[in-house]
């Protein structure tokens, strides 16, 4: 639900609706979430946005934006007519994103925001096992539709500032000298200075943690971004594999990368 997706959000929603109709037809349970940093979870007595803490900050713990939320847009738990009404309502909102004069129809908190993709992957560690348990599933498919990478996360770090008497807990950037450790699995992953490699590391971690979940990413992009996307995923532009994928994209307007 990021601002950069305004021009492609309608196509993204159409792709999502195709998935929903298929799941509904063959009776596959589903939940649909939209990531956002714009949804007000709570307000102060004066009416200002007052986000509640998502967790207790601790030194060396990955930091999650306090404004991060997941909006549960759709669920298979509702009846068919109710789901259709919800889909119509969301589609009306999406249509207004490209029309400046229609922005008044957007409900509070439903406007486009940043791209908290990495925060979402962290949250999936809780969402997916709960979903799998509720529906008694052996296998789960998790489909993520986005138009780009999220910003790298930081971690909490307590420092003593010269002008203050008490220690201050701030945030430190994660670089190649850092290791991500999953306290449940005990596995560690070396980080990198390349901001676009942060998401693949988080995906590797959650794939190791949840082996019965199949992760599928659907990336919506302009034609001019395809080559850059392939290179960002470690495909050398001088290799035959890269050239073949570019030829395939020109024919079909789509390309697949297997991890």
Give residue spans per PLM region:
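Acidic, glycine-rich A-domain
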Residues: 1-259
């Amino acid at each position: 639900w990021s601002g950069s997706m305004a021009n492609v959000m309608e196509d993204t929603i159409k792709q999502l609706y195709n998935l929903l109709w298929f799941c509904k037809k063959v009776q596959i349970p589903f939940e649909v979430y939209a990531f956002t940093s714009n949804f007000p979870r709570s307000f102060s007595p004066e009416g200002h946005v007052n986000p509640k803490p998502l967790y207790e900050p601790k030194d060396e713990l990955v930091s999650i934006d306090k404004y991060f939320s997941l909006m549960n847009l759709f669920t298979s738990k509702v009846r068919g007519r109710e789901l259709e009404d919800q889909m119509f309502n969301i589609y009306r909102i999406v249509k207004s994103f490209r029309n400046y004069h229609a922005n008044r129809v957007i409900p509070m908190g439903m406007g486009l925001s940043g791209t908290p993709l990495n925060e979402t992957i962290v949250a999936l560690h809780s969402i997916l096992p709960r979903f799998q348990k509720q529906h008694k599933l052996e296998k789960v498919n998790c489909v993520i539709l986005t138009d780009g990478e999220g910003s790298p996360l930081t971690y909490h770090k307590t420092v003593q500032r010269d002008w203050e008497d008490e220690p201050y807990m701030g945030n430190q950037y994660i670089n190649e000298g850092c290791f991500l450790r999953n306290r449940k699995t005990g596995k560690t992953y070396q980080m990198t200075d390349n901001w676009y490699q942060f998401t693949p590391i988080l995906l590797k971690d959650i794939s190791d943690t949840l082996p019965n979940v199949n992760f599928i990413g659907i990336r919506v992009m302009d034609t001019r971004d395809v080559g850059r996307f392939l290179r960002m995923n470690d495909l050398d532009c001088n290799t035959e594999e890269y050239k073949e994928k570019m030829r395939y994209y020109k024919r079909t307007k789509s390309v697949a990368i297997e991890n």
